[in-house]
Amino acid sequence: MRKSVLEKDVISQLHQKSIEIPVIGITGGKGGVGKSTTAVNIAEAFLQTGHKVSLVDADVDSPDDHTLLNIPLNNPRDVAITQPLFNDSNCTRCRKCVDVCRINALFQPKNSIPILISDCNGCEACFLVCPSDAIERGEKIVGKTYMTEMGNLRLFTGELIPGVEESAFVVNALKDELLMKLTIQI
């Protein structure tokens, strides 16, 4: 009788060194070629053979693994980036924050404090160069992460707020949540 490729002894033979948690990644560039469908089908195959599965939907612009699995998104957590808030009384109007901003998100009218005129990407360079401690840390929500548990499946999902360009912050928050959950459980 032929063994399934999902049996533990077959999986262990595929790896040169022993690993506690096998990882399968489905990646690619172009949308609509079936990455999510493939990932969900592989997850389902492992679930049907009794394995515990953590599925990560890091397509934060258009997450749809939960739709393909017909399960809700649970346990939402906001993902925020740092935004500068200017303290008028401390600002010396030196323009260092405006000059260091690589995306030109800051504008400083003559004899005034800087103004945030476009989306800040949260790099925090302005905080580092301000000589008078005139910038306080504010937050802007850029997305959410979710963690849904259904039986032996744990689905981690990241979702970017439409119109926001900084998807890396949501992907990194998703990765951190996954690693934290796996570290606690191991």
Q: Which positions does each model-derived feature cover?
A:
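FAD-binding core/adjacent interface of flavoenzyme oxidoreductases
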Residues: 139-151, 155-169
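Conserved active-site and cofactor/substrate-binding residues in soluble primary-metabolism enzymes
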Residues: 21, 34-38, 60, 92, ...
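N-terminal glycine-rich dinucleotide-binding loop that anchors FAD/FMN and/or NAD(P) in oxidoreductases
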Residues: 70-89, 155
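Switch II (G3) loop of P-loop NTPases
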Residues: 58-60, 131, 157-167, 171-186
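C-terminal lobe/tail of nucleotide-utilizing enzymes
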Residues: 1-17
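Cysteine-centered iron-sulfur cluster-binding motifs in ferredoxin-type domains/subunits
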Residues: 86-104, 114-134
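Short beta-strand-centered segment that lines the nucleotide-binding/catalytic pocket of NTP-utilizing
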Residues: 51-66, 138-144
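Walker A (P-loop) phosphate-binding motif
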Residues: 14-49, 53
